[in-house]
């Protein structure tokens, strides 16, 4: 799917170097196609790196996707130039009256922070409530899953004693579900979180369908029956070296982090890791875009007919 982004966005050249099909806004205007409008609420500190990761997964299908980047934290960023944020991100007030085919809410490094202490918690809640009336389908990733479960279902924050970090085996529970179409019976996916998502809690306190679980990582992929909500508790968007970067960051800070599970060859951080989850990540996002967004969204976004209570 050619992703439609501003001509000057750094991700354009980065992804083209990987032979990813990126269509600039100027070229897209020459095609008489109604693109899917996807809003990405990027909560990660290294925003450019996260943009590259998610845009890569949104890029592999024949339809156009018009990407809009959203921020809700007005504080000065330590990891992303202000010029980049000003040029490529919108504020919520800019889009609150608009409708979108899809919304992606990324993770955030807030695993040990109480919800009440998250500076932009009111803004997160506002976006999630707004999406009920303005977005066809929303995909929550990692920490955003925990936030959404609290806001939508009243589930309190659950935290692991030790950080879950590594590449874990997962089991597909519903291979014929639309979101898992084409999934292997077992596959690998990376996790990096303190958040805990016990399968029994999801089943007891929500009406969500658990599609994939992991013996070590708990519930991995679950969704609402009307396809308007999807939750992935891991990081299928991660690059091969993302977990390594987190490990060495914490090691250099004197935090004595555990070596990520099933990641470095022979568990040796001096050896370069390889991505073993890339095909799964692409398939997950293609399925979400096709079955949860494209197949159910109205052609005219002014005629949204939300069914989410």
From Swiss-Prot:
- The main place the protein resides is cytoplasm
| Annotated keywords | Acyltransferase, Amino-acid biosynthesis, Cytoplasm, Methionine biosynthesis, Transferase
Q: Which GO terms describe its cellular component?
A: cytoplasm
Q: Where is substrate bound in this sequence?
A: 163, 192, 249
Catalytic residues? Answer: 142, 235, 237
Q: Look at the named UniProt entry and state the broad enzyme category this protein falls under.
A: transferase
Which residue positions hold the site described Important for acyl-CoA specificity?
A: 111
The Swiss-Prot or TrEMBL record annotates one GO molecular function as:
homoserine O-acetyltransferase activity
Q: Does the keyword DNA damage apply?
A: no
Q: Which InterPro entries match?
A: Class_I_gatase-like, HST_MetA, MetA_family
What is the protein name stated in its UniProt record?
Answer: Homoserine O-succinyltransferase
The subcellular location is:
Cytoplasm
Name the pathway it acts in.
Amino-acid biosynthesis; L-methionine biosynthesis via de novo pathway; O-succinyl-L-homoserine from L-homoserine: step 1/1
Q: Which reaction does it catalyse?
A: L-homoserine + succinyl-CoA = O-succinyl-L-homoserine + CoA
One of its GO biological process terms is: L-methionine biosynthetic process from homoserine via O-succinyl-L-homoserine and cystathionine
Per the record, the similarity remark reads: Belongs to the MetA family.
Segments spanning the bilayer are none
* Protein's organism: Pectobacterium carotovorum subsp. carotovorum (strain PC1)
Q: What does this protein do?
A: Transfers a succinyl group from succinyl-CoA to L-homoserine, forming succinyl-L-homoserine.
Assigned EC number: 2.3.1.46
Annotated site residues (Important for substrate specificity) in this chain: 192
Which HAMAP family does this chain map to? Answer: MetA_acyltransf
